From Swiss-Prot:
Compartment annotation: Secreted
Protein known as: Somatostatin
Organism: Sus scrofa
Residue numbers bearing the Alanine amide modification: 43
Region (Disordered): 62-99
Lineage start: Eukaryota, Metazoa, Chordata, Craniata, Vertebrata
Length: 116
């Protein structure tokens, strides 16, 4: 009987601690700042996404980088390569329409142009 009460008390305590940890979790200030700017600005969705991506990628998480061990350096290099790839893709021009790709392209099939 005593062990059942003890188990119930420990279960209740763990639930209370879990709920307290969730409500006390810090929010990301960059996310809050981005949301405020996106509501205030009347820019297009693509510009906001590029801005947010650039802002996230410009500030690497220093706490993770400080705790790296030598075997984790290869993973850090891969993450840096992925970050550079994302920056390049964010800065690249959007896909052009088929007509803008090649001006001399006259291949078409049933009123639609094809990529030459």
């Amino acid at each position: 009987m005593l062990s059942c009460r003890l188990q119930c008390a420990l279960a209740a305590l763990s639930i209370v601690l879990a709920l307290g940890g969730v409500t006390g979790a810090p929010s990301d200030p960059r996310l809050r700042q981005f949301l405020q700017k996106s509501l205030a600005a009347a820019a297009g969705k693509q510009e906001l996404a590029k801005y947010f991506l650039a802002e996230l990628l410009s500030e690497p998480n220093q706490t993770e980088n400080d705790a790296l061990e030598p075997e984790d350096l290869s993973q850090a290099a891969e993450q840096d390569e992925m970050r550079l790839e994302l920056q390049r893709s964010a800065n690249s021009n959007p896909a052009m329409a088929p007509r803008e790709r090649k001006a001399g392209c006259k291949n078409f099939f049933w009123k639609t142009f094809t990529s030459c």
